[in-house]
Structures are given as C-alpha cells and as structure tokens.
C-alpha cells in the first residue's frame, strides 16, 4: 500500500494511516465486538484507496 501512496500522495497516505490507527484503537476498545470494527475499517480502507487512485 505504501508504494501506491508513497511520495506522490503524502497527505492521502497520512490520512489513511490515521484512519487505520483509529481502526486498531477501535479493535482494542471493542474487543468483544470485533466484527463492528472490522466492517468500519473495511469501509475506511476502501474509500481511502479510491481517493488515492483518483488523486
């Protein structure tokens, strides 16, 4: 992923990384509801990848 986002799209990469970090925090906070976090993360990752490709 970093090869796609690296250099050319630093702002996009940083935003995606923050979203991913938030997702990891969610999994830690809601360990018993991991499915909810996984779905949330998948949406963020997909939208982020689309944005990076378009820009």
Swiss-Prot record:
Its main location: secreted. Belongs to the worm B-toxin family. This is Neurotoxin B-II. Keywords: Disulfide bond, Hydroxylation, Ion channel impairing toxin, Neurotoxin, Secreted, Toxin, Voltage-gated sodium channel impairing toxin. The modification Hydroxyproline is found at residue 10. This toxin increases the excitability of nerves by delaying the inactivation of the voltage-gated sodium channel (Nav). Only acts on some crustacean. Neurotoxin B-II is less abundant, but 15-fold more toxic than neurotoxin B-VI. Transmembrane segments: none annotated. It comes from Cerebratulus lacteus. Disulfide bonds join 12-48, 16-52, 23-41, 26-37. Coiled coil: none annotated. The keyword Disulfide bond applies. Pfam families: Toxin_13. GO terms for molecular function: sodium channel inhibitor activity; toxin activity. One of its GO terms (cellular component) is extracellular region. It is found in: Secreted. It comes from the Eukaryota. The keyword Secreted applies.
């Amino acid at each position: 992923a970093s090869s796609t986002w690296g250099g050319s799209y630093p702002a996009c990469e940083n935003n995606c990384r923050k979203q991913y970090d938030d997702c990891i925090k969610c999994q830690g906070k809601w360990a018993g509801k991991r499915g909810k976090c996984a779905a949330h993360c998948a949406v963020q990752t997909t939208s982020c990848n689309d944005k990076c490709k378009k820009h």
